[in-house]
Swiss-Prot record:
Quaternary structure and partners: Component of the SWI/SNF-B (PBAF) chromatin remodeling complex, at least composed of SMARCA4/BRG1, SMARCB1/BAF47/SNF5, ACTL6A/BAF53A or ACTL6B/BAF53B, SMARCE1/BAF57, SMARCD1/BAF60A, SMARCD2/BAF60B, perhaps SMARCD3/BAF60C, SMARCC1/BAF155, SMARCC2/BAF170, PBRM1/BAF180, ARID2/BAF200 and actin. Interacts with PHF10/BAF45A. Interacts with acetylated 'Lys-14' of histone H3 (H3K14ac), and may also interact with other acetylated or methylated Lys residues on histone H3.
Keyword Cell membrane: no
Name of this chain's protein: Protein polybromo-1
Modification Phosphotyrosine, positions: 134, 1289
Sequence position, cross-link Glycyl lysine isopeptide (Lys-Gly) (interchain with G-Cter in SUMO2): 96, 154, 210, 425, 471, 511, 591, 638, 653, 1106, 1111, 1167, 1293, 1308, 1398, 1587, 1599, 1601
Cellular component terms (Gene Ontology): chromatin; kinetochore; nuclear matrix; nucleus; RSC-type complex
Modified residues (N6-acetyllysine): 414
Organism of this sequence: Mus musculus
The organism's place on the tree of life at top rank: Eukaryota
InterPro entries xrefs: BAH_dom, BAH_sf, Bromodomain, Bromodomain-like_sf, Bromodomain_CS, HMG_box_dom, HMG_box_dom_sf, PBRM1_BD5
Length: 1634
C-alpha cells in the first residue's frame, strides 16, 4: 500500500522547480500521470529504427563468430535451385531489403517487419528443421522481435519500473538524515555524472550541462515540454530543493528521457543519456549498500568541489580552505588534471538563465564547434536566405545525430595532408564561407551555392567514391539543392510578379524608374512574349517544350551533343536574381536555347519549328521596344551588326581569382585579331558535325573546340590554368594535324597557340619562381646547424661553446695550417661562403678535435667538445632527415664513429694523464712538507695552537663551514670570500682561520667572450690563513644545483653567491665541479617561492673588448674582399687503371682542368659552332695524352636541333640524348651543368650547380627516323672513395615543370605571315587600281524577274584559289613539308586518270570517281608527281589543260579573283587562246554573276568564282573603257550601282578534302554546276535561316541594310537584282545557245 501511495505522488514536485517552501506538492491521482506520459512518448523516426533493426540482423554473430545473415544475403538462383521457387512464391533476400532501405520505401516499421517475416518464413518453408538455415532463421527472427520491441515499446514500461525502484528506495537514506548530510550525498551523485568519461576520455555529460539554444533549436522546445539540464540540477542541490534522493532521481530520469525523445535511437546523445542514467543508479546503489562512515572532511571536500565546479566560485569556499590537508590536496590535484571541462556550466551559472543567454547571443561569437552556428546570428538575420542555406548544410545530421558537415568545418592540415593542396588548387571550407557571409561578400544565393559546390567537388576529387567523406558530400549536396529549391519557391510566393505564374502582369509599372529596373522590366516583357506565344488554331503554348531541360534518363544523348543546355526556368531565375548585366545577356541565353533545340532536333520537327517561330517573335518584340534611352550602341545599324552582342550570361560578377585567370586566357584567345582586324578564333569556336565532315573524326581521335572549353570552364572543371592550356593545345594540334601546312587555318592555329602561351606567361609571371633556391636552402641549413650548436646549453643554462672560446686558432702540431676557430667559421657562415655541408662539418670537427687533442680527458673543454660533436651529429641528421632532405658525404660520419674515435683517443691519453697526476701529487706532497717544516720551526719558538669548531668575534659566532668576507689587501678591492675549514687560537691569544678562497669573475683570467651566472664565484686552488679580526661579515656560497631552488635563511640576496666551476691559477682554466665537497655549513636552507631564472651575463672585460673590435674594423674592411669567394672542398686528381685503354693515355676518375674539377658522370657545355645554344656532353671517360686532356661521352641536343611539329611543346631547359658519342678536348668545355631525369628534375637538385644550368632529359632522339622516345635513364658509375660526390638536395614538395612552345613556332609563324602578306600584297595592288576606276557598266534594262532564286548559302562550301602567285612561290618552295600538295599537278593527273578509271568502272558516279583519283594521287610515287608538276610548267599559271570540248559553266576556282572594275591579269588577255568566249576570271560586275558560297567560319565571305561561256570568237565586254584591244568600245556612261561589293580577300584552302567535296557535288548528267532549278524555285518566306547561317551571310558586302528590315532581306534583294542582270546579259549578248 505504501508503495502505491508513493507512486500516486505528483511528479511535479521534482520538476517544476518551485521548491522554496520546502513542502511537497498536493498529490494527484494516478491516471493524470499516465496521460502525461502518453502525451510525451518519444517521437522516434521510423526510418532510423528500420536502419537500426537491419544493422542488428546484419551484424549478429553466433558462438563461432560467423555472421548468420550470410545465409540470407541473396536468394537461391532459379537455375541452381529451381525447386526453391516451387515452394516459395514470393522470394526475398537481404539485398532487396537493403535496397528498399536506401530508397526509403519503409515508411513504417511494420513494413520492414513484414519483409523480414517473409524472409524467415521462406527459409523455414524450404529448409529442413535441422538445417543451419532453419536454425539461423529462428534465431534472427527472435532477435528481430526483441530489438523491435526495445525500440518501439521502450517508453512507458521502463520509466514506470524506474519510478518504482526510486520510490521503494526513497526512504533508505532520507529518513532521519540531516539536510547537510543529504546534500553531501546528492553532490556525490552529481559528481559521479559530471566527471564520468568514455574510454577515449570524452566527458559523457558535456551535452547535458546546458539546455540547447532556443534560437538554434526552436523545435527542441516544441517537442520537449519539461526541459532540464545538469545546471538546473546543480542549482537545486545548492538551494536544498531536493528533500530526498528520489527527487533527484526523477530529474535525472527526466533528463535522460528528454534526450532520448529528441534524438534518434543509436545516436551518441541517445547512448550518453542511457549511460548517465546507468551511472546515477550505480552510484546510488553503491551509496545505499555501503556504510557511510568515511571522513566527513573527505566527503565534504569531494562533493563540494563537484558542486563548486557546477555552481561557480561563490559557494562553499570554506570547505576548500588553505590548510595543507592531504585529502584536500588529493582532490585538488585530481580536479587539476581534469582541467576546465565544466567551465561551460560554470559560465552559464555566472551569466544567468537561458533566456538571458539568448538575449546576449548576438555578442557571443565562437569560431569552432557547435557555437559557430550560433555566431552567424550575430551578424545576420535568421530569416536571411543566405543564412538558411548555410545553416542547412552546416547543421545537417545523420541518423546517429552526428553532424554530416563536420569534416568540412576547416581545411585539412597541410602537414598531415600535403598532397591535398597539390591536387586541390582552390581549397575552401565552411569557416571561409562563414567569413564571407559575415563580410557580406555574396551578392546572390548562386554565389553561395557556387562556393559550397566548390567545397563539395574538392572533397569528391580528393576522396575515393566509396569513402565515408564522399558519401557525406553526396548527402550534403542533396540537402543543399533541396533547400535551394525551397528558397526559390518561397521567393516565387513572395514575389508578386512571378513571370511564369502571372505571365500577363503589367509591364509598365510607374514605380520602377531607375535604369536597372527599366532594363529588368524590358527583359520581363521579352520573356513574356516567349511565354505567351501560342499556335494559331490549336492554342498550344509554343514554350512548353522549352520550360525545362530534357531528362538525363530519357535523353542521355542530349547532354553529349548539347554541351551548354539552357531552358526558360534558368532564364527566369537569372532575370529575377539580376544575373544579367544587360538585355544582351538574356538574348544570348534565349538564342542559345533555340540553337540547342535546332541542333538536336531534325529540321522540320515540331520543336525545330517552334524554336524558329519563338526566336522570330522575340526579335520582333525587341525591335518594337526599340533601344534603351541611354544605350548609344543601338543608334547605328552598322555598329549593331559589327559589335559583339552583350555580356556572356555565364560570366558572373562574382568569380574566384582562378576563374578570373581562366576567363582572361579564354578571352585573350577568342578576341585576338590580326592586323586587318580578322578574328582568328572564329573557325575554332565550334567543330563541324560528324555528318558534315566525317573524315575529320576519323583522323582526329580527341576533337576539341572552344565551346567545349568554355563549357568546361563554366562548370569549374579546370583546377588550374595548365588544365585549360592542355585543352587549347590539343585543339591547335588537331587543326595542324588535319590541315595542310600551307593553309590559313594552320597559320591561325600557330598564331593563337603563341597568344595562348604569352597570355599564360603574363598571368603567372616568372614560371621558374616556384623552383626553390637550393643555394639559399643549403646556406640556411648550415646557418641553423651552426646556431644550434653554438647555443647548445647544459641543464644550468651554460653554453658548451663558451669553454671552447679559449682554444688557440693554430694547432701547435701543424703550424702551417691556416688558423681556424669558431669565430672564423661564424664569419664564413654569415658571408654564405659554404656551399657544401661536408666542408662545413670538416671545419667544425677540426676545431672540436683540436680541443680534444690539446686538453685532458677529464677537463671541461674536452667533455664540452665531445658533447658539442655529438649534438652536431644529432642536429645534422634531424635537419637532413637522414638524407631525405640533403644527401651528403657528411652523413657517413655517425655517432658510432665518434664514440670509437673518443675511446681510441682516451686509451692513448689516459696513461700519460695518470703519470702527470702522480708527479703532481708528489710535488704537492713536497710543498706540504716544506710548509709543515716552516710552521714547526715557528711552533718551536713558542707558538701553540688550540683548534676549535667555532669562535666568536664582534658578537658573531663563526663555525667551520661558514663563508665569510675577508678584508682585502688593497682598499679599492672587493672583500675576499673564504670558506672556513679550520679555526684555532695561538698562544698569544689571537684567533686565526684557514680555508679555501673563492674568486669573482674579475679576479680570474678568461676571454672577454665568456659569460657568467649572476653572482657567480669560482672555487680556487688557493688556501691560506687569515686572522679572525680581518673578517668583515658572513656570506653564503651555494652549489649551482641548489642555488636556483633553495635560499638560506636570514641572508640578504647580495650576500648569497653561486659556484659552478673551479679555477686553476696555474693553468688559468676552468673546470666544472661534479661533486660539492665543501664542509657542512650550519646555515639552514628553505625552498624558494619561485625558482630563480638562469641568467648569464657578459664578462666585465667585454666592453673593453668592444673598443678593440672598433679599432680592428679597418682591418676587417681589408678582408671583405676575401668574403666574396666560396670555400671549396679539397680535392685531388684520382687516376684509374683502364684495362682496355690506349697506350700513352693516363685515365682519371677525377681531374682538375682550368680551375674546374671534373669527374666521370659530370655534364658540361661544349662549344658548338653555328648553333643558338651550346650542346651538352656527358663525361664517361677522361684521359690525358701528351699533356692534353680529353673526354668521351654522349651528346645532348636542344629541341631546335630536332624535327617536329611547330605546335609541339617542350619542358623548359629540355634536352634530348642523341645518337652521337664523341671524343672532345677539354679545351672546348665552357662550363659545368647537370642533366637530370624527369623524376629527379621534379624532386632534387645538385647543390653546386646554378638553377640556370640544370637541364631535363627524358627522351632519346633518333636521327634516322626523327622520333623521340623515352628511355630508362643515363648510365651510372661506381667511383672510388677519393672522388668527391655531389651533394643532392631533395625538395619537400615536387615542383611542376613548365612547358614552353617549340622554337620553330615563331619561325613558322613569321614564314607563313610573310607568305600571306605577299599574297595580300597582290590584292592590295589590284584594290588600288580598282579604287581609281570603280565605275561599272550598266547592262540594258530588262523587266525584273518575278520568281526569286534560292541560293544555297549553307550548302556550298568555299573553295579558295589553289594556285600560288609568283611572289609567293619562292617562299613556298623553301618550305619543305611532307604534306604539301601542288593542286596543279593533281589536276593534270586527274584529267588523265579519270578517263582510265571511268573505263574500268562505268557505273561509278562522279564523286566516286573523284575519290579514286584522289587515292591514286596519294599513292603515286614522288618522282611521278614531280613529272606532272614539270608538265604543268608549260601551261599558264592557274589554267588546267582541257582534254575535250567545254560546255556549260566552267569553274575558275584556280584563278585569282579580280576586284570589280580592275583590269584583267596580264597573263589572261580578254580573249584567251584555246578558251574562246571566256571572260577574265574574277570580274564581278553587273555583267557576271558569281556563284555565292558559304562564308568561312572566320567570318570572311567566300565563293567559287565562275565565268560564263559565250559563243565562239565572241569576247566579253571589259569592265570599263580602257586601252584593251579586245572588244568594241561601249559608249554608255557608267552609273553608280546600288550595291557596292568590297574586294574579295585571297584565302588559302582550309582543307585539302574541300576540293574533292566540291567535285562530288558535280553530276555527269547535268550541264551546269549549280542546282539552278531549285534556286529559281526558292522564295524568301519559305527559307528560314538559323542564327549560324545568318552569321555566315556576306553581310559586309553591303554598307547597311538600307530600307530593308533585316540584312537577309537586303541580300535577297541583291540576289534578285543579280539574277535580273544575268538574264539581261544573256539576252543582250545573245547567249541563249550556250
Amino acid at each position: 500500500m505504501g508503495s502505491k501511495r508513493r507512486r500516486a505522488t505528483s511528479p511535479s514536485s521534482s520538476v517544476s522547480g518551485d521548491f522554496d517552501d520546502g513542502h511537497h506538492s498536493v498529490p494527484t491521482p494516478g491516471p493524470s500521470r499516465k496521460r502525461r506520459r502518453l502525451s510525451n512518448l518519444p517521437t522516434v523516426d521510423p526510418i532510423a529504427v528500420c536502419h537500426e533493426l537491419y544493422n542488428t540482423i546484419r551484424d549478429y554473430k553466433d558462438e563461432q563468430g560467423r555472421l548468420l545473415c550470410e545465409l540470407f544475403i541473396r536468394a537461391p538462383k532459379r537455375r541452381n535451385q529451381p525447386d526453391y521457387y516451387e515452394v516459395v512464391s514470393q522470394p526475398i533476400d537481404l539485398m532487396k531489403i537493403q535496397q528498399k532501405l536506401k530508397m526509403e520505401e519503409y515508411d513504417d516499421v511494420n513494413l520492414l517487419t513484414a519483409d523480414f517475416q517473409l524472409l524467415f518464413n521462406n527459409a523455414k518453408a524450404y529448409y529442413k528443421p535441422d538445417s543451419p538455415e532453419y536454425k539461423a532463421a529462428c534465431k534472427l527472427w527472435d532477435l528481430y522481435l526483441r530489438t523491435r520491441n526495445e525500440f518501439v515499446q521502450k517508453g512507458e514500461a521502463d520509466d514506470e519500473d524506474d519510478d518504482e525502484d526510486g520510490q521503494d528506495n526513497q526512504g533508505t537514506l532520507a529518513d532521519g538524515s540531516s539536510p547537510g548530510y543529504l546534500k553531501e550525498i546528492l553532490e556525490q551523485l552529481l559528481e559521479a555524472i559530471v566527471v564520468a568519461t568514455n574510454p577515449s576520455g570524452r566527458l559523457i555529460s558535456e551535452l547535458f550541462q546546458k539546455l540547447p539554444s532556443k534560437v538554434q533549436y526552436p523545435d527542441y522546445y516544441a517537442i520537449i515540454k519539461e526541459p532540464i539540464d545538469l545546471k538546473t540540477i546543480a542549482q537545486r542541490i545548492q538551494n536544498g530543493s531536493y528533500k530526498s534522493i528520489h527527487a533527484m532521481a526523477k530529474d535525472i530520469d527526466l533528463l535522460a528521457k528528454n534526450a532520448k525523445t529528441y534524438n534518434e535511437p543509436g545516436s551518441q546523445v541517445f547512448k550518453d543519456a542511457n549511460s548517465i542514467k546507468k551511472i546515477f543508479y550505480m552510484k546510488k546503489a553503491e551509496i545505499e549498500h555501503h556504510e557511510m562512515t568515511k571522513s566527513s572532511l573527505r566527503i565534504r571536500t569531494a562533493s563540494n568541489l563537484a558542486a563548486a565546479r557546477l555552481t561557480g566560485p561563490s559557494h562553499n569556499k570554506s570547505s576548500l580552505g588553505e590548510e595543507r590537508n592531504p585529502t584536500s590536496k588529493y582532490y585538488r590535484n585530481k580536479r587539476a588534471v581534469q582541467g576546465g571541462r565544466l567551465s561551460a556550466i560554470t559560465m552559464a551559472l555566472q551569466y544567468g538563465s537561458e533566456s538571458e543567454e539568448d538575449a546576449a547571443l548576438a555578442a557571443a561569437r565562437y569560431e569552432e564547434g557547435e557555437s559557430e552556428a550560433e555566431s552567424i546570428t550575430s551578424f545576420m538575420d535568421v530569416s536571411n536566405p543566405f543564412h538558411q542555406l548555410y545553416d542547412t548544410v552546416r547543421s545537417c545530421r545523420n541518423h546517429q545525430g552526428q553532424l554530416i558537415a563536420e569534416p568540412f568545418f576547416h581545411l585539412p592540415s597541410k602537414k598531415k595532408y600535403p598532397d591535398y593542396y597539390q591536387q586541390i588548387k582552390m581549397p575552401i571550407s565552411l569557416q571561409q564561407i562563414r567569413t564571407k557571409l559575415k563580410n557580406q561578400e555574396y551578392e546572390t544565393l548562386d554565389h553561395l551555392e557556387c562556393d559550397l559546390n566548390l567545397m563539395f567537388e574538392n572533397a569528391k576529387r580528393y576522396n575515393v567514391p566509396n569513402s565515408a567523406i564522399y558519401k557525406r558530400v553526396l548527402k550534403l549536396q542533396q540537402v543543399m539543392q533541396a533547400k535551394k529549391k525551397e528558397l526559390a519557391r518561397r521567393d516565387d510566393i513572395e514575389d508578386g510578379d512571378s513571370m511564369i505564374s502571372s505571365a500577363t502582369s503589367d509591364t509598365g509599372s510607374a514605380k520602377r524608374k531607375s535604369k536597372k529596373n527599366i532594363r529588368k522590366q524590358r527583359m520581363k516583357i521579352l520573356f513574356n512574349v516567349v511565354l505567351e506565344a501560342r499556335e494559331p488554331g490549336s492554342g498550344r503554348r509554343l514554350c512548353d517544350l522549352f520550360m525545362v531541360k530534357p531528362s538525363k534518363k530519357d535523353y542521355p544523348d542530349y547532354y553529349k551533343i548539347i554541351l551548354e543546355p539552357m531552358d526558360l526556368k534558368i532564364i527566369e531565375h537569372n532575370i529575377r536574381n539580376d544575373k544579367y548585366a544587360g538585355e544582351e545577356g538574356m538574348m544570348e541565353d534565349m538564342k542559345l536555347m533555340f540553337r540547342n533545340a535546332r541542333h538536336y532536333n531534325e529540321e522540320g520537327s515540331q520543336v525545330y519549328n517552334d524554336a524558329h517561330i519563338l526566336e522570330k517573335l522575340l526579335k520582333d518584340k525587341r525591335k518594337e521596344l526599340g533601344p534603351l534611352p541611354d544605350d548609344d550602341d543601338m543608334a547605328s545599324p552598322k555598329l549593331k551588326l559589327s559589335r559583339k552582342s552583350g555580356v556572356s550570361p555565364k560570366k558572373s560578377k562574382y568569380m574566384t581569382p582562378m576563374q578570373q585567370k581562366l576567363n582572361e586566357v579564354y578571352e585573350a584567345v577568342k578576341n585576338y585579331t590580326d592586323k586587318r582586324g580578322r578574328r582568328l578564333s572564329a573557325i575554332f569556336l565550334r567543330l563541324p558535325s560528324r555528318s558534315e565532315l566525317p573524315d575529320y573524326y576519323l583522323t582526329i581521335k580527341k576533337p576539341m573546340d572552344m565551346e567545349k572549353i568554355r563549357s568546361h570552364m563554366m562548370a569549374n572543371k579546370y583546377q588550374d590554368i595548365d588544365s585549360m592550356v592542355e585543352d587549347f593545345v590539343m585543339m591547335f594540334n588537331n587543326a595542324c594535324t588535319y590541315n595542310e601546312p600551307e593553309s590559313l587555318i594552320y597559320k591561325d592555329a600557330l598564331v593563337l597557340h603563341k597568344v595562348l602561351l604569352e597570355t599564360r606567361r603574363d598571368l603567372e609571371g616568372d614560371e621558374d619562381s616556384h623552383v626553390p633556391n637550393v643555394t639559399l636552402l643549403i646556406q640556411e641549413l648550415i646557418h641553423n646547424l651552426f646556431v644550434s650548436v653554438m647555443s647548445h646549453q647544459d641543464d644550468e643554462g651554460r653554453c658548451y661553446s663558451d669553454s671552447l672560446a679559449e682554444i688557440p686558432a693554430v694547432d701547435p702540431n701543424s703550424p702551417n695550417k691556416p688558423p681556424l676557430t669558431f669565430d672564423i667559421i661564424r664569419k664564413n657562415v654569415e658571408s654564405n661562403r659554404y656551399r657544401r655541408l661536408d666542408l662545413f662539418q670538416e671545419h667544425m670537427f677540426e676545431v672540436l678535435e683540436r680541443a680534444r687533442r690539446m686538453n685532458r680527458t677529464d677537463s671541461e673543454i674536452y667533455e664540452d667538445a665531445v658533447e658539442l660533436q655529438q649534438f652536431f651529429i644529432r642536429i645534422r641528421d634531424e635537419l637532413c632527415k637522414n638524407g631525405e632532405i640533403l644527401l651528403s658525404p657528411a652523413l657517413s660520419y655517425t655517432t658510432k664513429h665518434l664514440h670509437n674515435d673518443v675511446e681510441k683517443e682516451k686509451k692513448e691519453k689516459l696513461p700519460k694523464e695518470i703519470e702527470e697526476d702522480k708527479l703532481k701529487r708528489e710535488e704537492e706532497k713536497r710543498e706540504a712538507e716544506k710548509s709543515e717544516d716552516s710552521s714547526g720551526t715557528t711552533g718551536l719558538s713558542g707558538l701553540h695552537r688550540t683548534y676549535s669548531q667555532d669562535c666568536s668575534f664582534k658578537n658573531s659566532m663563526y663555525h667551520v663551514g661558514d663563508y665569510v668576507y675577508v678584508e682585502p689587501a688593497e682598499a679599492n678591492l672587493q672583500p675576499h670570500i673564504v670558506c672556513i675549514e679550520r679555526l684555532w687560537e695561538d698562544s698569544a691569544g689571537e684567533k686565526w682561520l684557514y680555508g679555501c678562497w673563492f674568486y669573482r669573475p674579475n679576479e680570474t683570467f678568461h676571454l672577454a667572450t665568456r659569460k657568467f651566472l649572476e653572482k657567480e664565484v669560482f672555487k680556487s686552488d688557493y688556501y691560506n690563513k687569515v686572522p679572525v679580526s680581518k673578517i668583515l661579515g658572513k656570506c653564503v656560497v651555494m652549489f649551482v644545483k641548489e642555488y636556483f631552488k633553495l635560499c638560506p635563511e636570514n641572508f640578504r640576496d647580495e650576500d648569497v653567491f653561486v659556484c659552478e666551476s673551479r679555477y686553476s691559477a696555474k693553468t688559468k682554466s676552468f673546470k666544472k665541479i661534479k661533486l660539492w665537497t665543501m664542509p657542512i655549513s650550519s646555515v639552514r636552507f628553505v625552498p624558494r617561492d619561485v625558482p630563480l631564472p638562469v641568467v648569464r651575463v657578459a664578462s666585465v672585460f667585454a666592453n673593453a673588448d668592444k673598443g678593440d673590435d672598433e679599432k680592428n674594423t679597418d682591418n676587417s674592411d681589408d678582408n671583405r674582399a676575401e668574403d666574396n669567394f666560396n670555400l671549396e672542398k679539397e680535392k685531388e686528381d684520382v687516376p684509374v687503371e683502364m684495362s682496355n685503354g690506349e697506350p700513352g693515355c693516363h685515365y682519371f676518375e677525377q681531374l682538375r682542368y682550368n680551375d674546374m674539377w671534373l669527374k666521370v658522370g659530370d655534364c658540361v657545355f661544349i662549344k658548338s659552332h653555328g648553333l643558338v645554344r651550346p650542346r651538352v656532353g656527358r663525361i664517361e671517360k677522361v684521359w690525358v695524352r701528351d699533356g692534353a686532356a680529353y673526354f668521351y661521352g654522349p651528346i645532348f641536343i636542344h629541341p631546335e636541333e630536332t624535327e617536329h611539329e611547330p605546335t609541339k611543346m617542350f619542358y623548359k631547359k629540355e634536352v634530348f640524348l642523341s645518337n652521337l658519342e664523341e671524343t672532345c678536348p677539354m679545351s672546348c668545355i665552357l662550363g659545368k651543368c647537370a642533366v637530370l631525369s624527369f623524376k629527379d628534375f621534379l624532386s632534387c637538385r645538385p647543390t653546386e650547380i646554378p638553377e640556370n644550368d640544370i637541364l631535363l632529359c627524358e627522351s632519346r632522339y633518333n636521327e634516322s627516323d626523327k622520333q623521340m622516345k623515352k628511355f630508362k635513364g643515363l648510365k651510372r658509375f661506381s667511383l672510388s672513395a677519393k672522388v668527391v660526390d655531389d651533394e643532392i638536395y631533395y625538395f619537400r614538395k615536387p615542383i611542376i615543370p613548365q612547358k614552353e612552345p617549340s622554337p620553330l613556332l615563331e619561325k613558322k609563324i613569321q614564314l607563313l605571315e610573310a607568305k600571306f602578306a605577299e599574297l595580300e600584297g597582290g590584292d592590295d595592288d589590284i584594290e588600288e587600281m580598282g579604287e581609281e576606276d570603280s565605275e561599272v557598266i550598266e547592262a540594258p534594262s530588262l523587266p525584273q524577274l518575278q520568281t526569286p532564286l534560292a541560293n544555297e548559302l549553307d550548302l556550298m562550301p568555299y573553295t579558295p584559289p589553289q594556285s600560288t602567285p609568283k611572289s609567293a612561290k619562292g617562299s613556298a618552295k623553301k618550305e619543305s613539308s611532307k604534306r604539301k600538295i601542288n593542286m596543279s599537278g593533281y589536276i593534270l593527273f586527274s584529267s588523265e586518270m579519270r578517263a582510265v578509271i571511268k573505263a574500268q568502272h562505268p557505273d561509278y558516279s562522279f564523286g566516286e570517281l573523284s575519290r579514286l583519283v584522289g587515292t591514286e594521287w596519294r599513292n603515286l610515287e614522288t618522282a611521278k608527281k614531280a613529272e606532272y608538276e614539270g608538265m604543268m610548267g608549260g601551261y599558264p599559271p592557274g589554267l588546267p589543260p582541257l582534254q575535250g570540248p567545254v560546255d556549260g559553266l566552267v569553274s575558275m576556282g584556280s584563278m585569282q579573283p579580280l576586284h570589280p572594275g580592275g583590269p584583267p591579269p596580264h597573263h589572261l588577255p580578254p580573249g584567251v587562246p584555246g578558251l574562246p568566249g571566256i571572260p577574265p576570271p574574277g570580274v564581278m560586275n553587273q555583267g557576271v554573276a558569281p556563284m555565292v558560297g558559304t562564308p568561312a567560319p572566320g567570318g570572311s565571305p567566300y565563293g567559287q568564282q565562275v565565268g560564263v561561256l559565250g559563243p565562239p570568237g565572241q569576247q566579253a565586254p571589259p569592265p570599263y573603257p580602257g586601252p584593251h584591244p579586245a572588244g568594241p568600245p561601249v559608249i554608255q556612261q557608267p552609273t553608280t550601282p546600288m550595291f557596292v561589293a568590297p574586294p574579295p580577300k585571297t584565302q588559302r584552302l582550309l582543307h585539302s578534302e574541300a576540293y574533292l567535296k566540291y567535285i562530288e557535288g558535280l553530276s555527269a548528267e547535268s550541264n551546269s554546276i549549280s542546282k539552278w532549278d531549285q534556286t529559281l524555285a526558292a522564295r524568301r518566306r519559305d527559307v528560314h535561316l538559323s542564327k549560324e547561317q545568318e552569321s555566315r551571310l556576306p553581310s559586309h558586302w553591303l554598307k547597311s541594310k538600307g530600307a530593308h528590315t533585316t540584312m537577309a532581306d537586303a541580300l535577297w534583294r541583291l540576289r534578285d537584282l543579280m539574277l535580273r542582270d544575268t538574264l539581261n546579259i544573256r539576252q543582250a549578248y545573245n547567249l541563249e545557245n550556250v
